[in-house]
């Protein structure tokens, strides 16, 4: 085995992974959404058994902080729209990214309220409460660190329910506090609920990037309990009515997409019921309902929960709820991606540029792997030295494959050569490469992060394809500088076109990943020369020109 065969192995592994990824994306196609008209009035009907109400018509009020621009419906107090001013919709756009939306084409809302036997949001008690508010617009003023949005409702029995949204400067966590004043003569039995609902199928204007070779990050529901730190729940599973229904103390429920998330975190000492529901009209929901509490006559009961609505910033999410930071989708290589991101973020705190941080982390990773790389090249050199003996052995033993295998193993043992020694570093590099890919695709910090010159977004492909071409050139030089024992004409042709094949694949890859691969190839060229000089002194390498 030589370095060119290693390139072939890399290509086969890479292509196999991309085929598997495409198969994963297509094997469970999203169900076709029905018309979503009038979903604001029928949204939660299928969840009635949970005591979760349908929406209704009310007045829309605006709530703005430095990082959130929310629209809340006074009918029930649901958050029907959420804009994120700090995150542009697109590069160089003045429009903020919209996370929550209520339109005929797409529904994504954060519902909450008070249900249970005596809750005003219980469908059995009539329409959802129509809250009174002091004004139609609330804005966090300069010098103000907290904004409160109180909403009040008094039922026919004179009981007063106050729902207060509390937002803080620079914070994507919204506290939702409830106060229940019992004006009657009997105890009130109240439960809190929080529900996230979303159209299963994305409309064309939101479904971007699905036609290229990029890895597809998870979009769907998720939940966390003390027993299950993080569990995904696919939309198509909900659409098939295979729904979640568990009890938990603590935890959270969420809906996820690339870079952004919404989550309800209940705060109570009792047990919560976590559920999913197919609401019809092509809409899926995940939510929680708390254990009922009693508010005695003449007393006031207090309950609260937290809504996260914003980017998946890991340290901030971890501070809001245990394991909420796990919503960042690093795929099955999360155990590599997470420490890589922490190291990258630490480097960025000094450098201030994510592109240069990627370059530095590449040098660190390749430096750590240098002993393995050296062992790989040494093993391949020893294998090349044994080729004449192996060829003679094959000629002597003919078609006796069992004898050939036995004598080859004896030869390897006598010469202290591991035939798999050249593959081991390869098996380590591939997961690191893929983990970096997941990190670039899942870390919101790298979304629209500029590098230099024409690279304005490291998470997007190079608009001029310059980096992929440079990557192909470096790969070509590595191939030309590597000694080879490949004699099969077909393998030789494959190796000749390998840089071209990789270049084509990398045209659609994030610029940050291509940058990593270019720097890694340049480091490989330098390390190659250093290792070959050492091997020459040991008589294991010759600088003879490669035969074409």
Swiss-Prot record:
Protein known as: Membrane protein insertase YidC
Localization: Cell inner membrane
Function, as annotated: Required for the insertion and/or proper folding and/or complex formation of integral membrane proteins into the membrane. Involved in integration of membrane proteins that insert both dependently and independently of the Sec translocase complex, as well as at least some lipoproteins. Aids folding of multispanning membrane proteins.
Family designation: Belongs to the OXA1/ALB3/YidC family. Type 1 subfamily.
GO molecular function per UniProt: membrane insertase activity
Gene Ontology cellular-component terms listed: plasma membrane
Sequence intervals crossing the membrane: 6-26, 350-370, 420-440, 458-478, 499-519
Entry membrane topology: Multi-pass membrane protein
One GO term of the biological process aspect: protein insertion into membrane
InterPro entries: Membr_insert_YidC (IPR019998), Membr_insert_YidC_N (IPR028053), YidC/ALB3/OXA1/COX18 (IPR001708), YidC/Oxa/ALB_C (IPR028055), YidC_ALB_C (IPR047196), YidC_periplasmic_sf (IPR038221)
Alphabetized UniProt keyword annotations: Cell inner membrane, Cell membrane, Chaperone, Membrane, Protein transport, Transmembrane, Transmembrane helix, Transport
Organism for this UniProt entry: Escherichia fergusonii (strain ATCC 35469 / DSM 13698 / CCUG 18766 / IAM 14443 / JCM 21226 / LMG 7866 / NBRC 102419 / NCTC 12128 / CDC 0568-73)
Subunit description: Interacts with the Sec translocase complex via SecD. Specifically interacts with transmembrane segments of nascent integral membrane proteins during membrane integration.
Primary site of residence: membrane
Region of interest called Disordered, as start-end residue ranges on this chain: 28-55
Bias type Low complexity, positions: 30-50
Stored PANTHER family: CYTOCHROME C OXIDASE ASSEMBLY PROTEIN COX18, MITOCHONDRIAL, OXA1
NCBIfam families: PRK01318.1-1, PRK01318.1-3, PRK01318.1-4, yidC_nterm, yidC_oxa1_cterm
Domain of life according to the entry: Bacteria
């Amino acid at each position: 085995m030589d370095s060119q065969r290693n390139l072939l192995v890399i290509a086969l592994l890479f292509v196999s992974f991309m085929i598997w990824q495409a198969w994963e994306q297509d094997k469970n196609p999203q169900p076709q959404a029905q018309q979503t008209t009038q979903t604001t009035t029928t949204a939660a009907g299928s969840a009635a058994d949970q005591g979760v109400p349908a929406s209704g018509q009310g007045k829309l009020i605006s709530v703005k902080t430095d990082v959130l621009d929310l629209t809340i419906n006074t009918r029930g107090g649901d958050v029907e729209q959420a804009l994120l001013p700090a995150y542009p919709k697109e590069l160089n756009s003045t429009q903020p990214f919209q996370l929550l939306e209520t339109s005929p084409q797409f529904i994504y809302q954060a519902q909450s309220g008070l249900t249970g036997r005596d809750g005003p949001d219980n469908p059995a008690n009539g329409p959802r409460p129509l809250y009174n508010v002091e004004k139609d617009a609330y804005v966090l003023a300069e010098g103000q660190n907290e904004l409160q949005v109180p909403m009040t409702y008094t039922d026919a029995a004179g009981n007063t329910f106050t729902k207060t949204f509390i937002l803080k400067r620079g914070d994507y966590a919204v506290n939702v506090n409830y106060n229940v004043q019992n004006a009657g003569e009997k105890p009130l039995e109240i439960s809190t609920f929080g529900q996230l609902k979303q159209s299963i199928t994305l409309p064309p204007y939101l479904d971007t990037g699905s036609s290229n070779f990029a890895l597809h990050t998870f979009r769907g529901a998720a939940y966390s309990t003390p027993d299950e730190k993080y569990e995904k729940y696919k939309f198509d599973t909900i659409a098939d009515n295979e729904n979640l229904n568990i009890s938990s103390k603590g935890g959270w429920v969420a809906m996820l997409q690339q870079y952004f998330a919404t989550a309800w975190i209940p705060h109570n000492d009792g047990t919560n019921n976590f559920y999913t529901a197919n609401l019809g009209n092509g809409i899926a929901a995940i939510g929680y309902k708390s254990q009922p509490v009693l508010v005695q006559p003449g007393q006031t009961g207090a309950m609260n929960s937290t809504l996260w609505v914003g980017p998946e910033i890991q340290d901030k999410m971890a501070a809001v709820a245990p394991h909420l930071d796990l919503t960042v989708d690093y795929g099955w290589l999360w155990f590599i991606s997470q420490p890589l991101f922490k190291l990258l973020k630490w480097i960025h705190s000094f450098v201030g540029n994510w592109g240069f941080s990627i370059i530095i982390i590449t040098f660190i990773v390749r430096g750590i792997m240098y002993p393995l790389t050296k062992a790989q090249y040494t093993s391949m050199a020893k294998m090349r030295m044994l080729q004449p003996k192996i060829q003679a052995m094959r000629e002597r033993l003919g078609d006796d494959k069992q004898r050939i295998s036995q004598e080859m193993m004896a030869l390897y043992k006598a010469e202290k050569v591991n035939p798999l020694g050249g593959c081991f570093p390869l098996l380590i590099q591939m997961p690191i490469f893929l983990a970096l890919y997941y990190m670039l695709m899942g870390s919101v910090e790298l979304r629209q992060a500029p590098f230099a010159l024409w690279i304005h977004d490291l998470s997007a492909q190079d608009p001029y394809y310059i980096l992929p071409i440079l990557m192909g050139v470096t790969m070509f030089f590595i191939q030309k500088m590597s000694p080879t024992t490949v004699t099969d004409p077909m393998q030789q042709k494959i190796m000749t076109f390998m840089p071209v094949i990789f270049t084509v694949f990398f045209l659609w890859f994030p610029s940050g990943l291509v940058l990593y691969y270019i720097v890694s190839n340049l480091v490989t060229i330098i390390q190659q020369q250093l290792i070959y000089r050492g091997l020459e002194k040991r008589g294991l390498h010759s600088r003879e020109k490669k035969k074409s």
